[in-house]
Amino acid sequence: MAEEQARHVKNGLECIRALKAEPIGSLAIGEAMAAWSEISDNPGQEQATCKEEEAGASGLSKPCLSAIGSTEGGAPRIRGQGSGESDDDTETLGFPSRNLQASSTGLQCYYVYDHSGEAVKGIQDADSIMVQSGLDGDSTLSGGDNESENSDVDIGEPDTEGYAITDRGPAPISMGFRASDVETAEGGEIHELLRLQSRGNNFPKLGKTLNVPPPPDPGRASTSETPIKKGTDARLASFGTEIASLLTDGATQCARKSPSEPSGPGAPAGNVPECVSNAALTQEWTPESGTTISPRSQNKGKGGDYYDDELFSDVQDIKTALAKIHEDNQKVISKLESLLLLKGEVESIKKQINKQNISISTLEGHLSSIMIAIPGLGKDPNDPTADVEINPDLKPIIGRDSGRALAEVLKKPVASRQLQGMTNGRTSSRGQLLKEFQLKPIGKKMSSAVGFVPDTGPASRSVIRSIIKSSRIEEDRKRYLMTLLDDIKGANDLAKFHQMLMKIIMK
């Protein structure tokens, strides 16, 4: 299959060079255009059939039209077909009746030969195109055996000009060319030829252009391709390849600029989006020679043509880190909520502690003002209990022993009082206090803890002012009472004012 394709390509290149050296005349091109227009208007006549004559001993095989073109007044009208195209895609083209062998503008047709040099019959392939040429001016191009078998046109029926297809003889054929006889040409030469021909293109557009695929790169061949055997009903077998569809991340790569100028009308490109640096997973398909390339080998071979997924992995790491931070924040928020609940309890505990501190301070103040009697102090040396050693761990507390520390304030010693108590049949520790230690009676005309008695001194006026300020009387009345207090001079008037003030407050 590869040898046949190489042979067809070489034959096509030879045709292109021949056409470049000896271009077809404008008259022949005009007649060919007219015939092609008629065929386009009648699709039923687009494909014609041609059966191989078994009676002939010449062993004529089906010719292959590799290229048709012109450099005079128009671009070449050539269609190259690969092994992946079907027989239904072959184009037909009509030519006028001319002595193509004698004329320099004739078509050069080639036959397929095997390695022994003999013409191969029955070649059924997408690349094989038959050329039928008769004495009239509407010669047509048809496909291979498969196309002739599937054609709806009867072989014996006349065409549009009234000639039967079977009556036509084969076109004048030049000597056969082998694969070794044709000089190979690089793809750059083909593109250069197309560019030179497209510059002087003034020929009307027929809607057919030369599609020359770039030469396959053997270094890009992948081991993942699966050969598919395809029968051709001939001596050779066509081996295609199963093209795998791969998923690669990254943007679609920009296509290289074609060296040939477009032959058709231009299209507006104002709304074309710009290239992106990254995109979602896209399918990759490589039609060249039916080979596929893995993304890893492409990255190594092209050196960064395909976008690396390092940025995608970094984004995933950032997302994971953000999710972890969010989770930690939720934990911190839950702990803060629990702390807010404990805050109220802590405040209540602080209040209770403050109250206890106030109570302790009050008790300390009261204890500091109390005189504690020390055991053994004030005892009579003649008392038998005076020599008794007192436990040092015992602390003096008031009321523990009512008989202690009373010798200094009683009229009689403790021993005499005990003996007198025993004689009376009862024990008593009471004694009469000395007069200097006895409290004086409370005077009714003097201020004491029992009640306040105002006098003409400044202390009495200060006490009355404090009573007025701490009362719940209105402010206007307080100011009025302060004014009256300043005007009072005598003790009796001050006492009456105090009585009146207490009545107002009690109301």
Curated annotation (Swiss-Prot):
Spans annotated as Interaction with N0: 1-48
GO molecular function: RNA binding; RNA-directed RNA polymerase activity
Signal peptide span: none
Ranges for region Interaction with the nucleocapsid (N-RNA): 459-507
Modified residues (Phosphoserine): S86, S151
Keyword Metal-binding: no
Region (Multimerization): 304-376
Keyword Ion transport belongs to the record: no
Region (Disordered): 40-98, 134-174, 201-231, 251-305
Region (X domain (XD)): 457-507
Residue span of region Interaction with the L polymerase: 361-377, 396-410
PTM comment text: Phosphorylation on serines by host CK2 is necessary for the formation of viral factories.
GO terms under biological process: DNA-templated transcription; viral genome replication
Biased composition (Polar residues): 279-300
Acidic residues composition-biased segments: 146-160
Domain notes: The N-terminus consists of a long intrinsically disordered tail. The central part contains the coiled-coil multimerization domain (MD). Forms a four-stranded coiled coil structure. The C-terminus constitutes the alpha-helical domain (XD) that binds to the nucleocapsid (N-RNA complex).
Subunit-level organization: Homotetramer. Interacts (via multimerization domain and XD domain) with polymerase L; this interaction forms the polymerase L-P complex. Interacts (via N-terminus) with N0 (via Ncore); this interaction allows P to chaperon N0 to avoid N polymerization and non-specific RNA binding before encapsidation. Interacts (via C-terminus) with N-RNA template (via Ntail); this interaction maintains the P/L complex anchored to the nucleocapsid template during the sequential transcription. Interacts (via C-terminus) with protein C this interaction allows C to associate with the ribonucleocapsid.
Function, in words: Essential cofactor of the RNA polymerase L that plays a central role in the transcription and replication by forming the polymerase complex with RNA polymerase L and recruiting L to the genomic N-RNA template for RNA synthesis. Also plays a central role in the encapsidation of nascent RNA chains by forming the encapsidation complex with the nucleocapsid protein N (N-P complex). Acts as a chaperone for newly synthesized free N protein, so-called N0, allowing encapsidation of nascent RNA chains during replication.
Family stated for the protein in its record: Belongs to the morbillivirus P protein family.
Designated name of the protein: Phosphoprotein
Phylogenetic lineage: Viruses, Riboviria, Orthornavirae, Negarnaviricota, Haploviricotina
